[in-house]
A protein has these predicted regions:
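C-terminal active-site rim and adjoining tail of enzyme catalytic domains
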Residues: 3-8, 79-177
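Metal-dependent phosphodiesterase/phospholipase catalytic core, i.e.
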Residues: 1-79, 116, 172-176
């Protein structure tokens, strides 16, 4: 491909996964489906990549709940997240957890999640405001386009003496419900 005077090749998923494994870089692999996919697409994908995904500790996510179910059927130990573009009702799923757009995240959802063993990732965390909201609600992971900024925000938040108070308050709230 060519853009702004630069030229490069698009890597295949095989090459990308191999390189990530060499670098010990864990991936969150998103499976996007369409009506044109074969009914066996996930079986083929998991047959080819499932073992490596598990061994190297990668995770998966999809907006398509059938993908989540297929991954769980293949191997319950591969973490797979169900993408929720909106927070309207609390879902009951077999997913490891949920990936949610941060602006729809609220305390009600997080509180309901405490009663499960599921985790919560939020996207796209690129500002102090989105970081603070996500951090104070206790999400398990943040998806960002600005890793350096979020690392700095995390260090600052953890150095804040109110951080330990926040953890204590969250633990107390947990036992009140």
């Amino acid at each position: 491909i060519h853009e702004n005077g630069y030229e490069t090749k698009i890597s295949s998923f095989d090459d990308y996964l191999t390189r990530a494994n060499e670098l010990h870089q864990k991936l969150l692999i998103e499976i996007k489906t369409s009506h044109k996919d074969s009914p066996q697409m996930m079986e083929y994908f998991l047959e080819k990549y499932g073992a490596k995904i598990k061994v190297y500790g990668h995770q998966m996510q999809s907006l398509d709940y059938k993908v989540v179910e297929k991954v769980r059927e293949y191997d319950i130990d591969i973490p797979v997240y169900f993408i929720l573009p909106y927070n309207s009702v609390f879902p009951r799923t077999v997913a490891t957890g949920y990936t949610m757009e941060y602006s729809t995240l609220d305390e009600y959802f997080v509180t309901k999640l405490w009663n499960t063993e599921q985790k919560l990732y939020v996207w796209t965390i690129n500002s102090s405001e989105s970081f603070n909201k996500s951090f104070h609600l206790g999400v398990d992971g943040m998806i960002t386009d600005d890793l350096e900024r979020i690392k700095e925000e995390l260090v600052t938040a953890q150095e804040d003496p109110e951080y330990s108070d926040l953890l204590l308050n969250k633990a107390t709230e947990f036992f009140v419900y």
